[in-house]
Amino acid sequence: MNKTVELVKQWGIFEEKHPDGSIEDFCRYLLIHQRESESKLPLAGGVIPMIPAGLLLKLIGRINRLNMNYAYSALEGTGLNQLEEFGMLLYVQQEKNPRKTDVIHAHLLELSSGTDMLNRLKSRGFIAEQTDREDKRSKRLQLTASGEQAIEKGIQRVKKMATMMTHHMAEEDMLLCIKLLKGIDQKFSALFSSHKGKSFDEAYGEVMESTVSNF
């Protein structure tokens, strides 16, 4: 096949899958697709899912679990015990004076477990709590000086951990992964709260129906 025709064909395939993708994304896609087709690295972790979607989610889940486990040791000496605590402090720092429930929902936590985690951070002196002036039923959070210090210590450790976990990847590969996966994160982060209390079949039906209606 003529190389120009083949290139146009590959662009059509890419554009259909990633309509917002740039030419730079397409070039990364071609290079990685070629490289991965030649890769013979075995997969870790036992049973291999039967469909690509299952394998992708399994890999994401395993990497996340490994990341969480390394975080326990990486955060030693910072006053923080897990990545969720570090993430919550960062959220409070960035949002300045967020509502307690907003912090919990932003981290996709159940209200009870999220409240417990925030209470532990409060008891360690990392955050302070005050009543919302506009809604007396709500609480707002503020970072303390100790919380700022914990973030300063933690951010260096988390950066080192992220570098360690991805040191074998080229930056363009990471950027492409972000480009390809952020749509899933955005979509289901928006849907997650509305799916609480519904059966899986109901959630599945809503997602698939909206997908079909967009074509």
Which residue stretches match the model-derived regions?
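Long, hydrophobic, amphipathic alpha-helical segments used as structural scaffolds
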Residues: 71-75, 79, 107, 169, ...
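Generic structural concept
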Residues: 60, 64, 92-93, 144, ...
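A generic alpha-helix surface/boundary motif
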Residues: 69, 86, 159-160
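N-terminal leader segment of winged-helix/HTH proteins
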Residues: 1-78
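Charged, amphipathic alpha-helical coiled-coil/dimerization segments
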Residues: 2, 120-175
